């Protein structure tokens, strides 16, 4: 099983950061930890690399598991984060932006991500 880490990132307006991946799915930024890197550090780095947004971890959420298109099982550890700034696209991504919770609910492709959004909104400090 491959380990991953990602961020559910909100700005001060309570908008959430989403990416549109190579296959056209709207998702949260995530990726693989580098050797010697904690999952929290990996999540912060992946948000930066994939979106250009500097984010800080507020608290851990929970892991999700899925099988990727290559048949590899992945476990992604998620963190609630605060960030600001205009997103920019990493090569291979087809969209990025800040969205209201209502917009995000309509865009997110996977049920696990919808669940993460709801838990993150409940735990997000005012």
UniProtKB/Swiss-Prot annotation:
Q: Does the keyword ATP-binding apply?
A: yes
Where are its TM segments located?
none
What does the activity regulation annotation say?
A: Strongly inhibited by fluoride ions.
Q: What is the effect of changing residue 50 to Q?
A: Strong decrease in catalytic efficiency
What is its EC class?
Answer: hydrolase
Q: Which cofactor does it need?
A: Mg(2+)
- Gene3D superfamilies noted in UniProt: Nucleoside Triphosphate Pyrophosphohydrolase
One GO MF term attached to the UniProt entry: ATP binding
- Report the co-factor binding details: Also able to use Mn(2+) and Zn(2+), but the activity is less than that obtained with Mg(2+) ions.
Q: Where is this motif: Nudix box?
A: 31-52
Q: What does the record give as the reaction this protein catalyses?
A: P(1),P(6)-bis(5'-adenosyl) hexaphosphate + H2O = 2 ATP + 2 H(+); P(1),P(5)-bis(5'-adenosyl) pentaphosphate + H2O = ADP + ATP + 2 H(+); P(1),P(4)-bis(5'-adenosyl) tetraphosphate + H2O = AMP + ATP + 2 H(+)
* Entry annotated with the keyword Metal-binding: yes
Biological processes, Gene Ontology terms: AMP biosynthetic process; ATP biosynthetic process
Residues that, per the record, bind Mg(2+): 46, 50
What changing residue 26 to A does, per the record, is:
Strong decrease of the affinity for Ap6A
EC number(s) reported in the record: 3.6.1.61
Where in the numbering of this chain does the Nudix hydrolase domain appear? Answer: 1-121
What job does this protein perform? Answer: Specifically hydrolyzes (di)adenosine polyphosphates but not ATP or diadenosine triphosphate, generating ATP as the product. Diadenosine hexaphosphate (Ap6A) is the preferred substrate and hydrolysis yields 2 ATP. It is the only enzyme that symmetrically hydrolyzes Ap6A. It also hydrolyzes diadenosine pentaphosphate (Ap5A), diadenosine tetraphosphate (Ap4A) and adenosine tetraphosphate (p4A).
Q: Summarize the subunit comment.
A: Monomer.
What protein does this entry describe? Answer: Diadenosine hexaphosphate hydrolase
Per the UniProt record, the lineage of the source organism begins with: Bacteria, Thermotogati, Deinococcota, Deinococci, Thermales
């Amino acid at each position: 099983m491959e380990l991953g880490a990602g961020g559910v990132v909100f700005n001060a307006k309570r908008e959430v950061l989403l990416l549109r991946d190579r296959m056209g799915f709207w998702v949260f930024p995530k990726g693989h930890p580098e050797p010697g890197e904690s999952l929290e550090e990996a999540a912060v780095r992946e948000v930066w690399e994939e979106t250009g947004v500097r984010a800080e971890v507020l608290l851990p959420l929970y892991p999700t598991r899925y099988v990727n298109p290559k048949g590899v099982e992945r476990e992604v550890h998620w963190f609630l984060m605060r960030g600001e700034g205009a997103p920019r696209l990493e090569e291979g991504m087809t969209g990025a932006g800040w969205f209201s919770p209502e917009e995000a609910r309509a865009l997110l492709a996977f049920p696990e991500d919808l669940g993460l959004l709801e838990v993150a909104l409940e735990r997000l400090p005012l």
